[in-house]
Regions:
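Structural core segment of the AMP-binding/adenylate-forming
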Residues: 63-154, 264-266, 273-274
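Conserved AMP-binding/adenylation subdomain of ANL enzymes
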Residues: 65, 198-216, 226-269, 282-285
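Conserved pre-ATP/AMP-binding loop-to-beta segment of ANL
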Residues: 125-136, 143-179, 186, 196, ...
Length: 355
């Protein structure tokens, strides 16, 4: 189901099967229900970095009918506080630390900042649940707050083997909140429902991205954005594919890292943004040719892609074999609105739609 790739290359890749995912989601759901006291209709803010624990937590909350609101891991404690206050969350779920550019960053400090700022604005956080980057070891310098902060890995021991019946939801019941980036003012919370969103994320994953159960699919986006929700978690997993989650930056420790990951995991569907494509082209224009991978399909998303960048993406990254789908959509839509269809629509460099 999930291949979690740590940023440090010497650390092992965590291969999580669908059975293992089912077990871990159920155990986390039991903890969230019985320890955190969460129930259907509650809102919970997540401030997690790219990790296997992020989709596990999202799916556990969804199993309980609890509305999740994930904040991009790179955002500040204040940004998390704004979303805690707006959503009325009384539980925050985070991680102690994560790697970025080879450095282990203290992420726990942001939860303290978020809780303090939220309290100033009238929203008290009752519990902060903290996943450990290394199970059994606390990796942050920021101390825990007694009575409020709890280590998920420790508490999970009380729920091993637990099974939780999923909450039956109506199609229009909320599944999650996704806040816009706030580039045009205060971040706005977009609420996505259960039935329509899942149907659309699944349908576009299948027909636009050509995802099948045997595929290994890698979207380089962050789950903190709508692209990650729809096309790392909900879409690929609903189609029984294998979804790659990478912890760090694509050029660590060198520009060949993405293509080594693709080679080692047999990735055959690749999904990224023009900004990343431009960066990879600049720092390692000849790197893809050094690695033995084969993409059948490549997506570009998030912004227009210049024709010359598109051509490098097709010729060098795709090795003139992969179909490119250029897409346009919004946080509010939950899935692709404008795109070509692989193998059906002609491709045109820089065009997100019919050529």
């Amino acid at each position: 189901a999930i291949h979690f790739v740590p940023e440090l290359e010497e650390e092992r890749v965590d291969h999580i099967t669908y059975q293992e995912l089912y077990v871990r989601v159920n155990e986390m759901a039991a903890l969230l229900r019985d320890f955190a006291g969460l129930k259907r209709g509650d809102r919970v803010t997540l401030h997690l970095p790219m990790s296997a624990e992020l989709p596990i937590t999202m799916l556990a909350l969804a199993r309980l009918g609890v509305i999740h609101s994930q904040v991009f891991g790179g955002f500040s404690g204040k940004a998390a506080a704004d979303r805690i206050v707006d959503s009325g969350s009384r539980v925050l779920i985070t991680m102690d630390a994560y790697y970025r550019g080879g450095k282990l960053l203290d992420h726990k400090v942001k939860s303290n900042q978020a809780c303090d700022k939220a309290a100033e604005d009238g929203q008290k956080v009752d519990k902060v649940l903290i996943w450990q980057r290394y199970a059994g070891k606390y990796s942050a310098d920021t101390p825990l707050v007694d009575g409020r902060d709890f280590i998920v890995n420790d508490e999970l021991k009380n729920y091993y083997g637990a099974r939780i019946d999923p909450e039956w939801m109506n199609a229009e019941d909320p599944l999650f909140l996704m806040y816009t980036s706030g580039t045009t003012g205060k971040p706005k919370g977009c609420q996505h429902g259960t039935g329509g969103y899942l149907a659309y994320a699944t349908g576009t994953s299948k027909y636009v991205q050509d995802i099948h159960p045997e595929d290994v699919y890698w979207c380089m986006a962050d789950i903190g954005w709508i692209t990650g929700h729809s096309y790392i978690v909900y879409g690929p997993l609903s189609l029984c594919a294998s979804s790659v989650i990478y912890e760090g930056i694509p050029n660590y420790p060198d520009p060949g890292r993405p293509w080594r990951i693709a080679q080692n995991l047999d990735v055959n569907i690749f999904h990224t943004a023009p900004t990343a494509i431009r960066a990879l082209r600049k720092i390692g224009p000849d790197e893809p040719a050094k690695y033995n991978y084969k993409f059948k399909h490549m997506t570009t998303v998030g912004e227009p892609i210049e024709p010359e960048v598109w051509k490098w993406y097709y010729n060098v990254v795709g090795k003139k074999q992969a179909a490119i789908v250029d897409t346009w959509w919004q946080t509010e839509t939950g899935g692709f609105l404008c795109s070509t269809l692989p193998g059906i629509s002609p491709m045109k460099p820089g065009s997100a739609g019919m050529a």
